[in-house]
Regions:
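Noncatalytic alpha-helical scaffold of FAD-dependent oxidoreductases
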Residues: 1-329
Length: 329
């Protein structure tokens, strides 16, 4: 499906349902997010691909397969129906190993026509974001994954936990070095104050896409390394997006994150560059420290990183190629 995760969330909400995991944004293609294993960061459920019940793959011009785990919820009638709908014979395959391969297959096993995904009763997200100085409190939570230890405001056992980290020591030192975001899933029964449509659109985060080409254009005129103007822009961007005080919000899963277009401007067409590193949760703190130290070394060589670092925790997966794959015996 080319439908985004957010659209599917909002369609499900109209039926009193929701996807079990929400991730950190919702503009991605639903099928693409599953096939690449790049969406969803629920500490108790896992990623989006961990909620998939079956995958319908076209493996040749004349054959398709409906893959599910052994003892899965579908029967041969489902495969027969898909075959009639699409005019390609479909075979039901109920096999744990095939299912682990098919859920996150990076496009290598065939063309995804359909996915069957679990849905749960509609819930809302209670979100808390807090700023932290360049001290030990937020670093300690990287190790314990217990955000309440940082300042007592966050829940002890959240469903979602994320850090946004400034790549360099902030100037002035009284500015936040990191922001902690936790979310809990709570049953939705029409409570007042819960946003049901996307309203939180941060234009500042999209404007950051203009910084790298701007630097490239005026590179000869910008003194590197450690240019205070660039550091100031990065700090201002992060402050503007995440603030300097604690903030709370309540929203349905399809409303917590803004759409990719706003005021007629398609911000989804702007493209930056990113990299993703996966650590075992026990190595989260040393892993982040290695990244921060590397960025500092690169800045000394004149290569400044104009952005932030996002750290998310997710339950391990049994899908073979999932970035969050757990150790399997």
């Amino acid at each position: 499906s080319t439908a985004s995760v957010g659209v599917i969330h909002r369609d499900l909400a109209a039926k009193g349902l929701a996807l079990p995991t929400s991730g950190a944004s919702d503009g991605q293609s639903f099928a693409g997010a599953i096939a690449t294993g790049t969406h969803g960061a629920d500490m108790k459920v896992g990623a989006l691909h961990d909620t998939v019940l079956a995958v319908h793959l076209v493996v040749s011009p004349t054959r398709s397969v409906l893959v599910q785990a052994a003892g899965g919820p579908l029967n041969g009638k489902a495969a027969d129906t898909l075959g009639k709908w699409f005019g390609i014979a479909c075979e039901l395959l109920s096999d744990d190993q095939l299912f682990r391969a098919a859920r996150v297959h990076l496009g290598s096993l065939g063309v995804v026509l359909n996915v069957v995904v679990a849905a749960v009763p509609l819930y809302y997200l209670s979100r808390l974001r807090t700023p932290h100085l360049d001290g030990a409190s937020w670093r300690g939570v990287l190790r314990t994954r217990r955000p309440k230890n940082a300042n007592g405001l966050h829940p002890e056992d959240p469903d979602y936990l994320q850090f946004i980290v400034h790549p360099y020591a902030p100037q002035p030192a009284t500015d936040p070095r990191a922001w902690m975001v936790s979310m809990r899933k709570l049953a939705f029964n029409g409570q007042a104050g819960v946003a049901t449509t996307p309203t939180d659109v941060s234009l500042k985060s999209d404007l950051a896409d203009f910084l790298p080409p701007l630097v490239a254009l005026f590179e000869a005129d910008i003194e590197l390394p450690n240019n205070p103007l660039l550091r100031g822009i990065t700090s201002a961007q992060l402050r503007g997006i995440y603030g300097t005080t604690a903030a709370t919000s309540l929203a349905l899963p399809g409303a917590m994150f803004g759409p990719p277009d706003f005021l007629g401007i398609d911000f989804g067409s702007l493209r930056g560059a990113s990299a993703e590193y996966v650590f075992d949760a026990s190595q989260a703190r040393p892993g982040v420290e290695v990244i921060l130290n590397t960025l500092t070394e690169q800045a000394s060589a004149g290569n400044q990183y104009l952005g932030g670092i996002g750290v998310r925790f997710v339950k391990g997966s049994d899908a073979w190629l999932a970035p969050n794959a757990a150790s399997l015996n």
